[in-house]
Design a protein with these regions (language model features):
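Solvent-exposed loop/turn segments at secondary-structure junctions
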Residues: 68-71, 105-108, 254-258, 295-300, ...
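Glycine- and acidic-residue-enriched helix-capping/strand-helix junction motifs
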Residues: 69-94, 260-273
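Catalytic cores of nucleophile-dependent amide-cleaving enzymes
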Residues: 271-319
Length: 320
């Protein structure tokens, strides 16, 4: 292959065999990336002239809702983008005004032994008088992530020193701005208990337990009961955001390193249950809804095909 590409040629016969740093993130490269982004969009359904959107629509007439509306997720084999543009950001650039947005995700607090759980200065999860609020996101098949509203960082079970300064193995901390690694330790499972509490387990199903230094999840032991209280209902907030709007854009999809890559096989092609619930409620309240699906793996969309007039799909990971 290298011979055919001209890598060993004395003369630069192949214009693509000597890429330099000057070619990285150049204006030409950015234009190519933008072109690829445009061409990757696939129209799956379009009835009653739902698309393209009416250019006369004002920003105040539009609502964007859904967990992928203002999120940007890197694919496992994708490059590190020099900048990131979310769907919401792109739409606001087009309209030159802010657009109503709701991610549809619950906000929750955790309590244990009569105390709240909060992120300490070093990022570790500790007992506190006032609990921190976390954004709860369900990715299907039992996989949750929890992001601190206050710090913007994800809870995770520390796996190595790369995740903090000499961390304790398995210590629960919020010290990463994205859930992205070979083993995504920001994944948690929630096991309801008979008394209404829950036991949290990490991605390997090791329960979260507590000792004098904080909370850990590194071995098969008895998990500590934790109360998880919803302090803001994400779906109801999204429903309120779409009432009376002329156009709703519902952004659903995946984080491609959660639930599907080399060491993980999905058991279903359905959207995560909470995304399906959001779709049901939004379609019921405002039928002028277009599904914008951001995904790097396939989904069955029977419910969306039945309830919504239009569906478009794009992969994740492009900077534009």
């Amino acid at each position: 292959t290298k011979l055919r590409l001209g890598v060993y040629d004395r003369e630069n016969l192949n214009p693509y065999d000597r890429v330099t740093e000057d070619d990285i993130d150049s204006p030409k490269a950015r234009e190519i990336c933008k072109e690829l982004s445009r061409e990757s969009i696939v129209l799956l359904k379009n009835e009653n002239g739902a698309l393209p959107l009416d250019k006369a629509l004002k920003a105040e007439d539009i609502a964007i809702v859904g967990p992928l509306g203002d999120a940007w997720y890197q694919d496992w084999y994708g490059g590190t983008a020099p900048y990131r543009t979310t769907f919401l950001q792109g739409m606001e650039v087009l309209k030159q005004e802010n657009i109503t947005f709701a991610d549809g995700l619950d906000r929750v607090v955790f309590r244990c032994d009569g105390k709240g759980l909060a992120v300490a200065e070093d990022g570790t999860l500790q007992m506190a008088d006032e609990p921190d609020v976390f954004i709860k996101e369900y990715w299907g098949e039992g996989s949750y992530t929890f992001k601190s509203v206050r710090t913007g960082k994800y809870l995770g079970a520390r796996l190595s020193e790369s995740q903090g300064e000499k961390p304790k193995m398995g210590q629960i901390a919020a010290d990463r701005e994205e859930a992205f690694d070979w083993f995504v330790m920001e994944i948690f499972h929630v096991e309801p208990q008979e008394d209404g509490s829950v036991v949290l387990t990490n991605r390997f199903h090791y329960p979260v337990y507590k000792d004098a230094e904080g909370f850990f999840s590194f071995e098969q032991t008895e998990g500590i009961p934790i109360t998880m209280e919803v302090v803001e209902n994400g779906i109801e907030k999204a429903v309120a955001a779409v009432r009376g709007k002329k156009q709703v854009l519902l952004a659903l999809g995946c984080n491609s390193v959660i639930n599907a890559k080399e060491e993980i096989d999905r058991n279903t092609l359905e959207l995560p249950e909470e995304q399906e619930m959001l779709l049901d409620r939004i379609a019921e309240v405002n039928p002028n809804t277009v599904l914008v699906l951001f995904t790097n793996y396939p989904y069955t969309l029977q419910k969306a095909m039945e309830k919504l007039p239009a569906i478009i799909m794009s992969a994740t990971g492009s900077q534009d």
